[in-house]
């Protein structure tokens, strides 16, 4: 499967005076959380809520700032989440993708809203 990217809007819902940022994000269902580079956390004036330990792809562990809240928008979908500050690009993990009911389309290398629920996100609560 190649790399799948999508264009998302990130904003700080506690700071409506700050403009949202349009970003290209790597969508990875194998990752869990939203991860953003430090410069985006600064631009959105996101405060550190706590520190979290993360396990990186190479197996190393480190602690990183967990900031928020972050509003993530994609087409007619949005969610509110926190973000871990690390890396040099935006990484959209499974939690925000599930929250917005998004699907990955590997054949098109794209992110899309779930075609089975195009108007309203669906969640499973069993």
Give the positions of each predicted feature.
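Pepsin/retropepsin-fold aspartyl endopeptidases
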Residues: 1-126
């Amino acid at each position: 499967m190649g790399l799948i990217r999508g264009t998302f809007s990130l904003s700080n819902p506690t700071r409506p005076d700050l403009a949202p940022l349009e970003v290209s994000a790597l969508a990875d269902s194998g990752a869990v959380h939203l991860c953003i580079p430090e410069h985006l956390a600064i631009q959105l004036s996101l405060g550190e809520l706590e520190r979290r330990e993360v396990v990186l792809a190479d197996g190393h562990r480190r602690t990183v700032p967990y900031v928020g809240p972050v509003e993530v928008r994609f087409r007619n979908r949005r969610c509110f989440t926190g973000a871990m500050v690390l890396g040099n690009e935006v990484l959209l993990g499974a939690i925000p993708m599930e929250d917005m009911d998004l699907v990955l389309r590997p054949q098109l290398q794209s992110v899309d809203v779930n075609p089975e629920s195009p108007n309203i996100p669906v969640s499973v609560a069993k």
